[in-house]
Amino acid sequence: MLPLEKAFASPRSSPAPPDLPTPGSAAGVQQEEPETIPERTPADLEFSRLRFREFVYQEAAGPHQTLARLHELCRQWLMPEARSKEQMLELLVLEQFLGILPDKVRPWVVAQYPESCKKAASLVEGLADVLEEPGMLLGSPAGSSSILSDGVYERHMDPLLLPGELASPSQALGAGEIPAPSETPWLSPDPLFLEQRRVREAKTEEDGPANTEQKLKSFPEDPQHLGEWGHLDPAEENLKSYRKLLLWGYQLSQPDAASRLDTEELRLVERDPQGSSLPEGGRRQESAGCACEEAAPAGVLPELPTEAPPGDALADPPSGTTEEEEEQPGKAPDPQDPQDAESDSATGSQRQSVIQQPAPDRGTAKLGTKRPHPEDGDGQSLEGVSSSGDSAGLEAGQGPGADEPGLSRGKPYACGECGEAFAWLSHLMEHHSSHGGRKRYACQGCWKTFHFSLALAEHQKTHEKEKSYALGGARGPQPSTREAQAGARAGGPPESVEGEAPPAPPEAQR
């Protein structure tokens, strides 16, 4: 038997057996390793997946660097050191499932960040129940459309989340800007689908006109107040013109003045071929004017008589009638007017009696201002008849010519610039145009101006009348002498033409 000391010393000197790992201890070590890896949120997981899927070849310097970068991005997404093979397969299947969802469902399901395929399927089923579209569960890209179910589908390669929808704190890690997804068609160009599309387009074109008519009928009409100023009725335009005339101070007392405005301009150039609307003296005056124009060429001044014949005092017409005829050359008696009809039915003897009445103010009213002749070298000037509107208005009111048809109503239209009065509104409008620089025709005998060439021709016939009185019978029988002879046979003085100017006295010429 060994001593006690030796017995206690032997175990102390013997080497201790090595500690072998037990199965329980190994499992504890494996359970402690995942706890050291930080947990990642679903948003971070989706962001790492997008970085791997959206990586492009141009971001690396070469093919080897590209492969190394892809390995690194794939490890950041799948994390093989922290997940098992089953977990990594779950991520790949989930990605494929979310990529083939319909467009109307996929953004909402991806925004929920499903962690497993079962959770993603339950989200799609719940959304289909809410939208009441059971056809969505068939997995058709267009929902419950039966037309698209016959086609061949392609995998959608766009990212599952748009950059604006991915709200992750790891976006600021400098991974680079994610490009916007491009629109990729779900359906490949299948011949059957193209044929069905052509049939639908043909039906749409056939139904196009009917739909267009319905749209036009249902479209509200434009309010009329937008374009009513551009499309006024003629009656409204006439009413506006009438109001303007009233604002200017014109008195439209004649009911037929508006209808005569259009016809009086035509009467200036168109005369009655039969001469029924003109007096006999007017027709004789035309023949006398022709003889005057043939005898005296243009530019030659007719000689004025130095002494007035004794018969001129009786043949002198009223001065008011002369001025009225010169200012209104286009006026002719209207056959529809009862007063004009009465004047046409008057006999020549009645007109001669009117002409024979002496004008009380003839001596003073007919003395006009002197206008110098531009070709006179010694300053001599021929006497002209004054064309001022005041003297014309006074003479028209004093002379018996104011009793003629058309003048019995007075002269309500007066010019605001010169005060000259007119019986017709159209004559006043023509007179207004003369103040605006309208061309005037001047008589070379007395230098009196007229607005119309016809009025100048009528005025030149009066000078021919005066010339025939001065020459007497030296030049043979003239139209004026024949008129005088015809008047003598009728029992009265020779008929004078309205608008004739008497010769001036000799002392006025000096």
UniProtKB/Swiss-Prot annotation:
Query: Which CDD domains does this chain map to?
Result: SCAN (cd07936)
* GO annotations of cellular component type: nucleus
Q: Which PROSITE patterns match?
A: SCAN_BOX, ZINC_FINGER_C2H2_1, ZINC_FINGER_C2H2_2
Any idea where this protein resides? Answer: Nucleus
Would the keyword Transcription regulation turn up in this protein's UniProt record? yes
InterPro entries linked to this entry: SCAN-C2H2_zinc_finger (IPR050916), SCAN_dom (IPR003309), SCAN_sf (IPR038269), Znf_C2H2_sf (IPR036236), Znf_C2H2_type (IPR013087)
Q: What is this protein called?
A: Zinc finger and SCAN domain-containing protein 18
Q: Source species, please?
A: Homo sapiens
Taxonomy, top ranks, is: Eukaryota, Metazoa, Chordata, Craniata, Vertebrata
This chain is encoded by the gene named: ZSCAN18
